[in-house]
């Protein structure tokens, strides 16, 4: 499986979009059309890596640039300049945190019924709760424009620290029970570039200071570069060879990500009264495939890194179908 398969998914999304144009459902059309360029960029990244058009050493450095500079710039500029009036920010944060904790708790409670090793469980867990930022931000921007960037930043401010805490706790419990350190956990959260960008962006928004006019275009330009480069990196990181070896764990993780997490988000939206674009954005982010950075955490903290690579590749491919289906089937209920 390679770039050709991803291109077939692009064709599927495009054909579905044309068909649904005849039906007239504006939201379905908008979502599918937003996903087509995302899928094409991922396919291009996979093709560039497979054909060795660019040196393999480029991709890790590009991921580092995106994670520490470009994506934080996007969130910082988006939050600092966005009009958040009328957006139920606190309710949206509550929905995202509650749904994430619900699914995480469910997976831990039923861990023994999965009949997998402790390292394998940590990979299944990451696949169930982590999300691919680049796909989410691109889809949100395609659906809601500049407001989508602000909603994406709010989603990150809620999910990123929650997921980091949960994943570190799970690794500490199942892989390294003697190595857990609250100090290290707090350092990870405080120095996370995405969390820091959201914090300072919200600070400038709340205080009304804004970004100084001389440097605002700098952050805007850096942010605009984050999405295409990030999606190319997602494609370059795909490794389908590992997916064939662990079909059952891959399916368990995908079930948690594409079924349990969206359903938990729907329940949280209904319980807390979140509606409209904020509810759809919350549902969108909780139906995303897992993050490629999950592989790095699995390798560094004693998880099953090969299995994690298979989960990442499989979910990214499955998302071409499962992601829009999950969002569109449940969006009418929020």
Locate each region found by the language model.
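Alpha-helical transmembrane segments of multi-pass small-molecule/ion transporters
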Residues: 5-334
């Amino acid at each position: 499986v390679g770039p050709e398969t991803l291109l077939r998914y692009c064709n599927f999304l495009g054909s579905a979009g044309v068909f649904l144009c005849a039906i007239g459902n504006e939201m379905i059309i908008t979502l599918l059309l937003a996903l087509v360029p995302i899928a094409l960029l991922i396919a291009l990244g996979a093709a560039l890596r497979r054909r060795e058009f660019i040196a393999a050493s480029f991709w890790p450095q590009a991921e580092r640039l995106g994670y520490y500079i470009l994506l934080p710039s996007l969130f910082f500029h988006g939050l600092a300049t966005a009009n958040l009036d009328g957006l139920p920010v606190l309710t949206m944060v509550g929905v995202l945190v509650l749904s994430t904790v619900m699914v995480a708790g469910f997976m831990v409670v039923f861990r023994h019924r999965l009949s997998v090793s402790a390292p394998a469980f940590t990979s299944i867990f990451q696949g169930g709760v982590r999300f691919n930022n680049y796909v989410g931000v691109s889809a949100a921007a395609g659906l809601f424009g500049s407001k989508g960037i602000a909603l994406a930043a709010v989603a990150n401010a809620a999910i990123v620290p929650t997921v980091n805490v949960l994943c570190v706790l799970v690794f500490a419990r199942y892989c390294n029970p003697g190595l857990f350190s609250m100090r290290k956990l707090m350092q990870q959260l405080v120095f996370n570039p995405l969390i820091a960008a959201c914090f300072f962006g919200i600070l400038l928004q709340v205080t009304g200071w804004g970004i100084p006019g001389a440097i605002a275009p700098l952050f805007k330009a850096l942010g605009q570069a984050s999405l295409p480069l990030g999606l190319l990196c997602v494609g370059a990181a795909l490794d389908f060879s590992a997916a064939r070896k662990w079909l059952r764990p891959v399916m368990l993780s995908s079930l948690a990500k594409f079924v349990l997490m969206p359903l938990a988000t729907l329940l949280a939206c209904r319980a807390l009264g979140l509606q409209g674009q904020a509810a759809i954005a919350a549902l969108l982010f909780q139906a995303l495939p897992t993050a490629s950075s999950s592989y790095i955490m699995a390798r560094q903290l004693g998880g099953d890194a090969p299995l994690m690579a298979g989960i990442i590749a499989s979910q990214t491919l499955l998302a071409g179908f499962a992601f829009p289906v999950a969002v569109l089937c449940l969006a009418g209920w929020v």
